[in-house]
Amino acid sequence: MPEEVHLGEKEVETFAFQAEIAQLMSLIINTFYSNKEIFLWELISNASDALDKIRYESLTDPSKLDSGKELKIDIIPNTQEHTLTLVDTGIGMTKADLINNLGTIAKFQDQTEYLEEMQVKEVVEKHSQFLGYPITLYLEKEREKEISDGKAEEEKGEKEEENKDDEEKPKIEDVGSDEEDDSGKDKKKKTKKIKEKYIDQEELNKTKPIWTRNTEDITQEEYGEFYKSLTNDWKDHLAVRYFSVEEYVSRMKEIQKSIYYITGESKEQVANSAFVEQVWKRDSRVVYMTEPIDGYQLKEFDGKSLVSVTKEGLELPEDGEEKKRMEERKAKFENLCKFMKETLDKKVEMVTVSNRLVSSSCCIVTSTYSWTANMEQIMKA
């Protein structure tokens, strides 16, 4: 049976591992997580993935962020209950997925040291320098406060009347009072020192990702750490190269009206693609994008539209003679295109003669308003 607990204003259900699963997870954790800090970094990484997911989905469905939620990660240690809670505002699994696939791993005895403030800070500082989301640590702390004796008794009475824990209200505890005789009551009021509980918030990853900072402020060591984190190549990087769309536009020919780009899984894949043959032949340039989000993020720059060379409707600069030759080719191969369309039937929308190829015989393009072929593969995965 699940145990109901309260986290903030929401009710949360906690499901425990079955005995045999608990033994298996204990074996896995002690075998693969020999470095104990990894478990916390795994949770932070998962939270970051959940935030990435809702950010990506909001690009095509802005209503995903209608609630106005800030994309963030909160870390809440509780030394009394020996729990470490991570809360993100992203998209995760359904309740059924959580029950089937997850459990409360952080309660294992070896991980209790990460309830300490310095341990959490050390891990986050070490691993989160390339996360673009704020990570906030919430700690319950105590401080002494001096108030009048009457006010202290009033707050203490209210606390007993409510009979519940309230983190926002001070916990009253006598730690001392002014010594004075009865004759001095009218001259000076008694005061008491109380211990007041409060929640201390601290943003842990104040160092922002290098791509959001001025290039002049970034050291070679930071570039090296970023390269290793991004590529999992623990050798030093060879060089650093900056790319800007401004530079691309400055080198465009006057006849070129659009910025060409291609998306793919790697630089080698897009560089050897049939789609870039004609663009390179015309001495134009193509922007290689190897991150899935790139195709969503960039639509226009400085009044020039960004055009994918893998979609239909690609218009390359042509003079009068080239246009004439293209019309002749279309007329010459019109019957062949009809035959291929009839043969392929519903597998393709149309078959046309293209001016985008040089050495390749054919290519398959996507419609103007659909996903690119690379994005379709990602969504199917």
Curated annotation (Swiss-Prot):
Q: State its role.
A: Putative molecular chaperone that may promote the maturation, structural maintenance and proper regulation of specific target proteins.
Organism field: Homo sapiens
Q: Locate the residues binding ATP.
A: N46, D88, K107
Report which gene this protein is encoded by. Answer: HSP90AB2P
Q: What protein name applies here?
A: Putative heat shock protein HSP 90-beta 2
* One GO molecular-function entry: ATP hydrolysis activity
- Chaperone keyword on record: yes
Any single GO CC term annotated in Swiss-Prot or TrEMBL for this entry: perinuclear region of cytoplasm
Q: Which family does it belong to?
A: Belongs to the heat shock protein 90 family.
Q: Which GO terms describe its biological process?
A: cellular response to heat; protein folding; protein stabilization
Q: Which chain regions cross the lipid bilayer?
A: none
Q: Name one Pfam family in it.
A: HSP90
Renumbered residue ranges of the record's region Disordered: 145-192
Which residues are annotated as modified residue Phosphoserine in the UniProt record?
S177
Q: InterPro entries annotated for this entry?
A: HATPase_C_sf, HSP90_C, Hsp90_fam, Hsp90_N, Ribosomal_Su5_D2-typ_SF
Instruction: Please give the coiled-coil regions recorded for this protein.
Output: 315-347
